[in-house]
Amino acid sequence: MQFQGRSRRKYTGAKLKSARGKRKFELGREPAATHVNDTKRKNVPTHGGNRKVRLLQENIANVTNPADGKTIVSAIETVVDNAANAHYVRRNIITKGSVIQTAAGNARVTSRPGQDGVVNAILIE
């Protein structure tokens, strides 16, 4: 768990007087870091009794061809480019905006695999 609330220090380094303590809703979680491998999902409970599906590993993607609007299920071979972090390419981590090599060709990921539990992508011409 990671605290995502306000810092307890000023920009000068001095401590702020806190009117209250930390709250559970201010906690975040570690990133999913979706890898290219056999499918592995994890359900995470969220606010209001809902749930999020964390995609930990995936080897298929829903790839849409923008020219004709058709969507096919295609196998993911590797991660080609990732603007979020250059080291993610080496580790084959899929995030939104990363370019993956599929059987249909190179595609840009449009979904958030760690939040949505699925890899959706659009073919790059």
UniProtKB/Swiss-Prot annotation:
One Pfam family from the record: Ribosomal_S8e
Keyword Ribosomal protein belongs to the record: yes
Disordered: annotated span: 1-34
Basic residues: bias regions: 1-23
Any one annotated GO CC term: ribosome
InterPro entries: Ribosomal_eS8 (IPR001047), Ribosomal_eS8_CS (IPR018283), Ribosomal_protein_eS8_arc (IPR020919), Ribosomal_Se8/biogenesis_NSA2 (IPR022309)
Gene3D superfamilies, alphabetized: 2.40.10.310
GO MF annotations, alphabetized: structural constituent of ribosome
Keyword Ribosomal protein among UniProt keywords: yes
Coiled-coil ranges (or none): none
Top-level taxon in the UniProt lineage: Archaea
GO biological process: translation
Keywords on record: Ribonucleoprotein, Ribosomal protein
Subunit relationships: Part of the 30S ribosomal subunit.
Alphabetized HAMAP family for the sequence: Ribosomal_eS8
Family: Belongs to the eukaryotic ribosomal protein eS8 family.
Stated name of the protein: Small ribosomal subunit protein eS8
Organism annotation: Methanococcoides burtonii (strain DSM 6242 / NBRC 107633 / OCM 468 / ACE-M)
Encoding gene per record: rps8e
